[in-house]
Amino acid sequence: MNTFERNFWSLYVDFLEAFSEVKYKGISIPYLCHFRSLFTNHHELKQNLSSESFSQQLYQTVQDKKLFQQRFTEFKKMHTNNKVKRKANGKVALYNAANLLRFPIEITKKHFKPEHSFVIRDIRGKTTSPRPITAEGLPAYFLIDYDESIDHHVELIQKQVAGIIEKHKKHPLFGHPTFKEAFNAQVERIAHRIIESTNMIKKLPISCIVFSSTHYYQSRTLAIVAARHNIPTICMQHGIVGSENGYMPKIADVDAVYGHFEVDWFKSIGVADDGVKVIGHPRFDLINKEATITKETLTKKLGLDPKKKNILLIVRGNAYIKHWRKLLDEWDGHDQYNVIIKDFPAQTPHPLTENYDFAVSSKGYHLYTLLPHVDVVVAYLSTVGLEAMIAGKPVFLLSIPAPTYSGYYDRLGQMVQKEPVGLANLVNRYFVSEKFRAKESSKRKKFLAYAYPNVKSSGQRLIELIAEMTKGQGKA
């Protein structure tokens, strides 16, 4: 572990230990929290996480991620009750935490029928009908409908929290005024989520819950309550494991992952073999679907020069913008490329399109609409790199990793560059050297065999996993 990681996980364990007795309905609340958001506004602490001396201010020292994950594995086991009888004729519940599930409508319609599935949502909108049906044709149930008034209980818990904070005034996190406010807010919401989840599970026939993430308190709490009622849980992988912070700790019974990278990574932090299954992701099933628009039409719509090569450049707002400018400067004057800039999450033209005549906006076209008609994809260390390779496209990546970067793309070797000039030269080389194109193709295929083994559709693999985990259910 580097300094940042060691300090981060040590700080996390400080939190778990100090507040372990803060419980509601027998569940230790700190284990359910979204930890990082407890110090969102504590900028000094976030800077100090990279400092060697910061560890001297902490109570705990985490040297092994396995030991950290083990805490949550034991916590989950403590709240798992395999003796509870499930309701007969249970249905699969889909819970889209933080809008990260990303199941395309057509995939959901194909694999999740309304007689066997439903959607769990948090709150109702102002115009939500009493019994709403989603765009996929599935009934929706709202956790807020199963809530109760527990103000007195919340006040008692928050009073307990205040007493603990008073004892740890000198701690770099607990002693900061923004921590108490953030933690109290999560305490209240988690207590309500425990009530909502318990009441919903008691009243609805649920055979399995599929999550988009268990990183957030909303979904993590539901997953633990589900374990108490012997309901199996599956957590989909919503993006590449770029930063380990987004995937630790593991909470669901099974994490449905993209490929062998994640299997090996989860094993490295002590997760058992049966806790991880290679499923892929249902949205990727649409990547190689027949193009929805012709190249001629796209060329006209985007104002491309049909004689030039098309490069798709993936950016994220103004992140790394100085690097992208250097990249485009290298191509300025070459008069060989159309550079289509696709920003995320914005749909408006990126500022870079104003500075370079050969750079154009993607005009909101979906990634999978663009991929069939580009020659090369250039991106930062994002999931788009994997998606483009699944589409059979050469991918060249700019590497500016976070302190918790997992090394996901390391197997691509020189196709990943730290400097924009080197990245630009690599793309130039790809277009002029047949030998280099063959090398890139070989690297990409080997990478995909490890990162995304495409045996059968992900949607089908997920349905088979659900069937395996709910085997024997349906008996009263």
Question: What is each model feature region?
Answer:
Residues 90-95, 186, 198-216, 312, ...:
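Short N-terminal targeting/anchoring amphipathic segment
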